[in-house]
């Protein structure tokens, strides 16, 4: 599974518009890799089967988006650990992988290159090969101070004295 995290300036756009831009870029990346992908609402599909799911929201003027692209996986293991959906109004989608659709799993490098090539122009941004040391340090501080705390992850009130 290739995970994608995007943080971008909102620029006045609504969430559905931003999600559609991201889904379209991911679908183009998947087509670069050799599969006939289509951007759907909050997903990318191939022949009606979901290969990528997206979710996101705004934090003030900033879009925070996450996506998971199924490159290759052990479907039997996935089926064994997931709880089946029993809601007839919202049946679980059929899923597929890039390996199944193009005959082999593309390398991580190929997937990242395709995603970067399609996402960068949409967001008018460069996509570096790695985070700068100061970005890594900031991410580690934020993880330790807030995002990685159990209370944040579990949606519980912060401990006394923690903001």
Language model segments and positions:
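Structural motif
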Residues: 46-47
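A glycine-rich, hydrophobic loop/mini-helix early in the fold
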Residues: 1-11
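Long, positively charged amphipathic alpha-helical accessory segments at protein N-termini or as interdomain linkers
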Residues: 9-38, 50, 57-163
């Amino acid at each position: 599974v290739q995970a994608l995290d995007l943080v971008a300036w909102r620029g006045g756009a609504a969430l559905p518009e931003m999600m559609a831009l991201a889904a379209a870029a991911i679908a183009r990346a998947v087509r670069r890799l050799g599969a006939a992908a289509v951007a759907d609402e909050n997903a990318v599909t191939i022949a009606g089967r979901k290969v990528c799911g997206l979710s996101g929201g705004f934090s003030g003027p900033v879009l925070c988006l996450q996506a998971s692209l199924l490159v290759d996986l052990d479907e039997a293991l996935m089926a064994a650990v997931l709880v089946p959906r029993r809601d007839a109004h919202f049946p679980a989608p059929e899923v597929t992988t890039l390996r199944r659709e193009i005959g082999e799993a593309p390398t991580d490098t190929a997937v990242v290159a395709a995603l970067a090539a399609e996402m960068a122009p949409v967001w008018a941004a460069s996509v570096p090969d790695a985070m700068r040391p100061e970005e890594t340090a900031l991410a580690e501080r934020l993880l330790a101070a807030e995002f990685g705390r159990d209370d944040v992850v579990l949606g519980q009130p912060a401990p006394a004295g923690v903001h």
